[in-house]
A protein has these predicted regions:
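Residue-level detector of anion-binding/catalytic polar loops
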Residues: 24, 265, 344
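Ferredoxin-type iron-sulfur electron-transfer modules in oxidoreductases and energy-metabolism complexes
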Residues: 236-257, 275-368
Length: 368
C-alpha cells in the first residue's frame, strides 16, 4: 500500500479540504463522558490524550499524557445510523375523492457526509449491512445514504479488554471498504487511499512517502494490538455452527436468569438490522405514512404474530439472537454477524460477556 506521511499539524488541511468539497464532517468528540461522532470543523475539537477503559458492563474515559487523537477503542455507536436510519418513512398512501389509493415512495435526499476515525470492526459491520440491504433487491433509502458517505478509517492501536476483532478476522487493521485509511503515530499519521475519491483527495497534497521506519512502527503497533487481544480468552468463532445443535443446553436458562432483555446489545451492535414497520394515520386525513424503525429481537413484541408471541421467554430470545448472529448468519451472508467490537459486552447493564457464553455453549459437548 502506498502510504504517505501526514504530519500531525497538517491534519487540519485534510479537514479543510473535505469541508471545501461540501462534506459535512463527523469526527470523534467527547460528550457526556463518552466518545461519540459529531460535526467538527477543527482538529481542536478531536479528543487529545483520551483513552477508554472497557469491561463487562463498564465504559469510562481517562486522560493520559499523549498527543494522540485516536487512542481509544470504539464509541458507543458505530456507523449504522448514517446508513440505516433509526426511524424513517418508506412510503405514503393517499385516497382521493373517488376512493382510489395512490402510493408514493419516501426517498431521502441525504447530504454528503465524511466520517473520520472509523474502526476496522465498524467498516466490517458496514459490509455486513451492505450484504443485507444491497444484495438482490436493494433498499433504495439505505443505498442513497450509503453512497453519500466518505469514510476515513483509523487503524486501532488501543483495543479495549472487550475487543475481539482479531478473533473474528476483522481487525485491528482495516482491510477494505474505506476511502482513506490512517495509522496514528505520536508525531503524525500514515495515510493511504482505498478508493478513487480518496486517491483524488490525496493528490491535492504533496505529503512525502512514509519512511521504512514509520511503516515498521505502524506494523509493530498493529502486532501489539493483535497480541493484546489474543492473550484474552475467546471462543473459536469458526466453530460456532454447533449452536444450532445446542438448543436445549442448560446455559440458555443460566444466561436468561441474568439477562434483562433490555436490547442494549442490539442497539449498540453495528451489524444488527432488526426493525418493525408501522402505519401512521391522522383523523380526517386521507394520507397514511408507512414507517420503519429500529427494533430488537429481545423485545417481546418482535416475535408476535397472529395473536401469539413465538419467543415469549428471555431464554428463547437470547437463544435466537446468539444462534442467528454466530451460526445462521453464515447461511444467509457467508460469515458470522459479529465483527468483535465488544460493544454488547461493555454496554450490557449486567455485564454478560458474549465470549464466555459462546465458550460455554460451543465447547461443551456434554449437552448436545
Amino acid at each position: 500500500m502506498d502510504f504517505r506521511y501526514l504530519p500531525r499539524q497538517d491534519l487540519q488541511l485534510l479537514i479543510d479540504a473535505l469541508r471545501q468539497q461540501a462534506y459535512r464532517l463527523l469526527g470523534p468528540v467527547v460528550r457526556q463522558n463518552a466518545i461519540v461522532y459529531d460535526v467538527i470543523e477543527s482538529v481542536a475539537e478531536l479528543p487529545v490524550g483520551i483513552q477508554d477503559e472497557q469491561s463487562p458492563g463498564s465504559y469510562r474515559l481517562h486522560q493520559v499524557d499523549s498527543p494522540r487523537n485516536f487512542a481509544w477503542a470504539n464509541s458507543p455507536q458505530a456507523l449504522k445510523p448514517l446508513s440505516f436510519a433509526p426511524r424513517e418513512s418508506l412510503w405514503s398512501a393517499r385516497r382521493d375523492e373517488h376512493g382510489v389509493l395512490s402510493f408514493e415512495p419516501c426517498l431521502p435526499e441525504p447530504e454528503q457526509i465524511a466520517v473520520i476515525g472509523i474502526r476496522a470492526c465498524d467498516l466490517a459491520a458496514l459490509d455486513l449491512q451492505d450484504r443485507h440491504f444491497l444484495q438482490q433487491n436493494a433498499d433504495p433509502a439505505y443505498e442513497r445514504r450509503r453512497e453519500s458517505l466518505f469514510l476515513i478509517a483509523v487503524n486501532c492501536s488501543h483495543p479495549a479488554a472487550t475487543c475481539f476483532c482479531s478473533h473474528s478476522g476483522d481487525g485491528p487493521s482495516v482491510k477494505t471498504g474505506y476511502d482513506l485509511v490512517m495509522t496514528e503515530l505520536d508525531d503524525g499519521y500514515l495515510i493511504a487511499s482505498g478508493s478513487l475519491r480518496g486517491k483524488l483527495l490525496l493528490e491535492e497534497f504533496s505529503w512525502a512517502v512514509a519512511s521504512a521506519e514509520q511503516r515498521r512502527e505502524a506494523e509493530l503497533q498493529a502486532q501489539a494490538s493483535i497480541e493484546q487481544m489474543q492473550a484474552q480468552a475467546a471462543p473459536d468463532l469458526s466453530a460456532t455452527d454447533v449452536l444450532t445443535s445446542r438448543l436445549e443446553h442448560p446455559r440458555w436458562e443460566e444466561v436468561a436468569a441474568r439477562c434483562l432483555a433490555c436490547g442494549n446489545c442490539t442497539a449498540v451492535c453495528p451489524s444488527c438490522f432488526c426493525h418493525r414497520e408501522i402505519d401512521e394515520t391522522e383523523l380526517g386525513s386521507p394520507t397514511t405514512t408507512h414507517l420503519r424503525e429500529w427494533d430488537s429481537c429481545f423485545g417481546q413484541g418482535h416475535s408476535y404474530i397472529h395473536g401469539l408471541t413465538v419467543r415469549s421467554e428471555t431464554r428463547l430470545r437470547y437463544r435466537q439472537w446468539l444462534t442467528h448472529k454466530f451460526a445462521t448468519w453464515k447461511e444467509q451472508y457467508g460469515r458470522i454477524g459479529c465483527t468483535g467490537c465488544g460493544r454488547c459486552i461493555s454496554w450490557c447493564p449486567v455485564g454478560i460477556d458474549v465470549r464466555e457464553e459462546l465458550v460455554a455453549l460451543c465447547e461443551d459437548a456434554a449437552h448436545v
